[in-house]
Amino acid sequence: MEERFRNLDYQNWKPVRTLGGDSYGTVYEIARDDGFGMVDHAALKVLSIPAAPEDFDTLVAEGRTPEEVTALFHRQVETIARQLMAVDAISDDPNLLRCEDHVIRAHADGRGWDIYVRTELLPSLPDYLRNHPHGEADIIRLGAGLCSALETCHRRGIVHGDIKPRNVFVGGGNFNEQVTYKLGDFGMAQFSAVDNTNDFMAPEVLCGAPVSPASDLYSVGMVLYWALNERRIPFVPLPPTAVEASDLAIAREQRLRGDPLPEPLHGSQAL
């Protein structure tokens, strides 16, 4: 990751810091001098297909020809490109993280591609909630914003597939302006194995079913629960108790069994 950060080559933008990463890629803060004494900042997600160079060799070792493996990964890149173009067409929706540009580059060895997705730079929901008190009205606005984003996307046949707090962003809030909650990072969950440690995915997806509009709505509900429950998912200990890996595993089993969720710590009965 550090080598990629140092060698990041994206148009005239320079890396500032690494913001995070997951199995789908790494996100950086980048900056560019506009030539008039101002510096623009943005977020850049870099996704590699295949995710690791050895993935190519593994498939060849399993009996596929290099040409077949290249064609397989090329189809994934084409699907991602179509998804990005579809999201670009609706990125002016106020509840979607604005996508400003995307670039696809083939590797020099012909065995893969890097996909660069530049978006507006905003704090994620966990970072925002750590520094801003929030009440029931804020959570209602959060839910309304995420549902509005999904309505726009599902109408176009776009399923997110990986809704979690880190993929929700917060804009506005300056000079008493009301904040806007935005959904970002669309479509990447469909091109990697299901993350069985994702505690916001619907149980059927964790069990192998494809993502769907219904599973997106389930994940929104889990995000709202998390926000109302001191940023803890169902069935795990509440603060100040630390959450252990065993707690998460047991909580996941309870969700998969369909156990009734305990009420979150905050929020009215009506909510």
Residue spans for each PLM region:
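Conserved short submotifs of the Hanks-type protein kinase catalytic core
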Residues: 110-124
